[in-house]
Amino acid sequence: MDKFRVQGRTRLSGEVAISGAKNAALPILFAALLAEEPVELQNVPKLKDIDTTIKLLNQLGTKIERNGSVFVDASGVNEFCAPYDLVKTMRASIWALGPLVARFGRGQVSLPGGCAIGARPVDLHITGLEQLGAEIKLEEGYVKASVDGRLKGAHIVMDKVSVGATVTIMSAATLATGTTVIENAAREPEIVDTANFLNTLGAKITGAGSDRITIEGVERLGGGVYRVLPDRIETGTFLIAAAVSGGKVMCRDTRPDTLDAVLAKLREAGADIEVGEDWISLDMHGKRPKAVTIRTAPHPGFPTDMQAQFSLLNLVAEGTGVITETIFENRFMHVPELIRMGAHAEIESNTVICHGVEQLSGAQVMATDLRASASLVIAGCIADGVTVVDRIYHIDRGYERIEDKLRALGANIERVKGE
């Protein structure tokens, strides 16, 4: 397995171009199964999870070419089963189910794998599709969905806010007869992006970005060209890299309006921040950040995917900061690794109390999930000595060429190929 070897005590400064959002590109790629004509997707990041999705769509009979843009032609889909060998590495595969049953009347997906953070049940996807008229069976480790004729619009009140299930229901409802209303829908920017993509193909979706989404079913979806929105979590990660190192960074090709909660907390931590239409600059003027208190929440609250990075900020900040994780259980696995580097923290159920220290020390640490691993790499950049981060395949699932981008900011980082 590959590792990162990072030589520390670096102040990270410079410019970074932000890639397309993984969490928008994935649902959009699966939603392209609904289209009867070719689709061109621009700004799709080059990531492990994207490669897995392309393989999976290929197995279903979709023709895909990657040549700058990703070209998807789902007119020849002739397989309706997403097999275990691909699904096991990535939970997002469940997003194949809604489009398959909506367009072809049947689909089956192996129960999924992916990051090791807590229970992310598929039951909300299943109940949503059942309310649209699909018959669902769980057999031999597969979720099997079928419907006679077309799905039927329904008024769906979601038990809890779920990005994944909102995508499944919204995508499937585009080809249902009648109108579907989703109440208590997720409001994330990636939901809005998926809805905008589907509307480009001829869907009739309104209200995305609010907690009430309305979908008027249409007979078919055509083709189109769509540009995936920039990755707000990658943006936030590079802003943190500058903030914890006393540095200065300019993030280009990004969307400041998707990062309100994160920018507010960075300002509270003492960062000098300016924004334009598609850029954000952060300058710490060489100062240490101040500790902040954070509680993760569904959008527009503070994103759980930035929690690990802000844990690092608090652990090297002036003062004591408290972080409460309300979205996923078991999402503090990076904290014991940072303690190995000299951080002072206590975990109490879903809360971590961070006592800032002036300097971390290099150590051997292990990545446990995608966002945790990014915080460990950045910790290595500012620690005294050498840090080796193991199991970095987690990082490759969600960050495009993170080592190249960090190097451009002055980091001393190399990828060590594993056996």
UniProtKB/Swiss-Prot annotation:
Keyword vocabulary terms for this entry: Cell cycle, Cell division, Cell shape, Cell wall biogenesis/degradation, Cytoplasm, Peptidoglycan synthesis, Pyruvate, Transferase
InterPro entries in alphabetical order: Enolpyruvate_Tfrase_dom, Enolpyruvate_Tfrase_sf, MurA_subfamily, RNA3'P_cycl/enolpyr_Trfase_a/b, UDP_GlcNAc_COvinyl_MurA
Main location (coarse class): cytoplasm
CDD domains, A to Z: UdpNAET
Active-site feature positions: 115 (proton donor)
GO terms for MF: UDP-N-acetylglucosamine 1-carboxyvinyltransferase activity
Function: Cell wall formation. Adds enolpyruvyl to UDP-N-acetylglucosamine.
Family: Belongs to the EPSP synthase family. MurA subfamily.
The name this protein goes by in its record: UDP-N-acetylglucosamine 1-carboxyvinyltransferase
Organism of origin: Serratia proteamaculans (strain 568)
